[in-house]
Amino acid sequence: MNKTYTLNNGVQIPAVGFGTYKAADGKSADVIKAAIGSGYRYFDTASFYGTETYLAEAIRQSGLPRKDFFIASKLWKTEMGYENARDAFRRTLENLETDYLDLYLIHWPLPEPGYENWKELDRETWRALEELYAEGKIRAIGLSNFLPHHIENILAGCTVRPAVDQIEYHPGYSQEAAVQYCKENGILVQAWSPIGRSRVLKDPLVCELAAKYRVSPAQICLKFAVQRGIVPLPKSSSPERMKQNMDLFSFEMEQEDIWRLATMPQSGWSGEHPDQERVYF
């Protein structure tokens, strides 16, 4: 699986990545090592995940050169602001045992719901990323969980346009307005939680399509992203499912089925929204 997309600055990015959130809950790099063994080369981490050092260990032990990997990380809500962002980036490089990142994102647009000066804070943070990009320390810069009104604020004052916006995206929560906005503005959408939750995997439509195409319900969810030009970032601790989650190019869904998935009633939402308190189910 060598399919890639070209970002708006010409950088090539793999079409599927591996999400490392909770990938080191056992305080070991074993899950990430298994993902490398399963063929993943694009890894998505974040300072908040606590997995940067485990990813570094797994890459070091793989024996593969750094250039074979596409490594993305994010700065957390408490690391926003110009100086904080530069400090956060330096810590991330140390944790990852590398001298550059392929992609660096602002994790959330607001440090907390209701934060009044978020526009200024976001622009200040973005300026730090632009400088790091200009210094050659990051190959591409982007956003995470930013909705159109947040992105507009960045675009109004940036010198480097965001290459990526990583949002929650899966059947039952496909954030169509945000996806459309990003596509119109040359921003590649990435999907976190691309499989949704167990409710999505058990959804009658998802199961019907899995039977129709002779794949797993998870593969239907991931293909839903891929077929719409969105990069899914699945995570799994099972080597068998890791491989399955990469096998997305041996089948194609009919357009009618894509529309059916896109118009499913809301299901499997994480409860997270950048402008509001988290909802717990």
Predicted regions span which residues?
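N-terminal binding-site loop/beta-alpha segment at the start of enzyme catalytic domains
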Residues: 1-69, 196, 281
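Acidic (Asp/Glu)-rich catalytic clusters
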Residues: 8, 56-66, 93-98, 155-158, ...
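Acidic-and-aromatic substrate-binding clefts and catalytic sites of carbohydrate-active enzymes
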Residues: 23-26, 44-54, 78-83, 112, ...
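Short, acidic/polar
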Residues: 24-35, 81-96, 149-151, 174
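Residues at the N-termini of beta-strands
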Residues: 42, 100-103, 140, 164
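A short, structured active-site edge motif that brings together acidic residues
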Residues: 66-79, 103-109, 166-169
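CE4/NodB-like, metal-dependent polysaccharide N-deacetylase domain
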Residues: 85-106, 131-135
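Beta/alpha (TIM)-barrel catalytic core signal, keyed to glycine-rich beta->alpha loops juxtaposed to Asp/Glu
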Residues: 111-281
